[in-house]
């Protein structure tokens, strides 16, 4: 069938860094233990690393929402926690889904690209069916 959704998101790293570890913010319970561990293992700023992952999660949600054009969005509560950005041994990102979103996107391949430039992190997600 081909591409069914495309999403992109940009994140201000300084703004994100101010909020990421604050109790009660949207970011407090958003990242998996693996994502937080990977961020703390990086030589650069953990906030910079997590900002790109937040952008990836948002890009996946936007791609999924776009794939449901003219249909009611079905966004589970705590959806960000069910979208995990993992990397292979060479640092290439991949999205791992769990929970309700994994059921909805079971037959979809998700391609994701992350980048940082200056004070901005960005991600693009493409949803593809075979």
From Swiss-Prot:
Primary site of residence: cytoplasm
Sequence positions that bind Mg(2+): 9, 58
Catalyses which reaction(s): apo-[ACP] + CoA = holo-[ACP] + adenosine 3',5'-bisphosphate + H(+)
Physiological role: Transfers the 4'-phosphopantetheine moiety from coenzyme A to a Ser of acyl-carrier-protein.
GO annotation terms (biological process): fatty acid biosynthetic process
E.C. numbers: 2.7.8.7
Native source organism of the sequence: Mycobacterium marinum (strain ATCC BAA-535 / M)
One Pfam family recorded for the sequence: ACPS
Gene designation per UniProt: acpS
Stated family: Belongs to the P-Pant transferase superfamily. AcpS family.
GO cellular component terms attached to this protein's record: cytoplasm
GO molecular function annotation: holo-[acyl-carrier-protein] synthase activity; magnesium ion binding
InterPro entries noted in UniProt: 4-PPantetheinyl_Trfase_dom, 4-PPantetheinyl_Trfase_dom_sf, ACPS, Ppantetheine-prot_Trfase_dom
Localization (cell): Cytoplasm
Necessary cofactors: Mg(2+)
Protein name stated in the entry: Holo-[acyl-carrier-protein] synthase
Keywords: Cytoplasm, Fatty acid biosynthesis, Fatty acid metabolism, Lipid biosynthesis, Lipid metabolism, Magnesium, Metal-binding, Transferase
Class of enzymatic activity (EC top level): transferase
